[in-house]
Amino acid sequence: MKIRNVFFPLLIIGLSWSCSNDDEEIHEPMGDYANGILVSNEGPFSNGTGTVTFISEDLSVVNNGIYKMTNDEDLGNVVQSIGFTENEAFIVANVSNKINVVNRYTFEKIASITDGLNNPRYFIEANGKGYVTNWGDTADETDDFVAIINLQNYTVEGTISVILGPEAILAKDNTVYVAHQGAWGQNNKVSVINTTSNELIKTLTVGDVPNSMQLDASGNLWVLA
């Protein structure tokens, strides 16, 4: 009887300690920049560097230049956009023809992609690969493309030729949609790419200068032009 009275309180204490530890592990922050908003700042055109700002969810903290603060190097000229995978951020520097890959929660650098890009614009993950819109040489309306990024070794493993001015990019299942704003000119198309075959399967005509897209709950594609 005495043994039973001692055993049950100890069992309760052990269970309470175990649950408490589990809760602490679940809520442990993944990094300094896990809970908040990331803002890409282009920086001055043709010189200097772009930056990234972190704003906490409660708006009480604003940290500017977090990439340089963490890695002691500049991002590159004209930070065009930031795209994400589950654990990584892909920071696209347009004029520098570079994508810096970082841990999205700590902002520690993982890799830089510099080969196979030409005026990169926007990144998205689809079907286990990365896709980046590229304007190419803006004086040449025939060299625009979407670069295919190997997410294991962070290299460009292929390209898909597209029409003038690929800009915003959106993914759904095995399909990628590319809005063609027209670079420095004008366009009115959306390219549809199959990410299994990495082939352009269709081109849709929309309003002039499409600049953003959204899928609704029914899977319909909406294009703002």
Can you describe what each PLM-predicted range is?
Residues 15-18:
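C-terminal motif of bacterial Sec signal peptides marking the signal peptidase cleavage site
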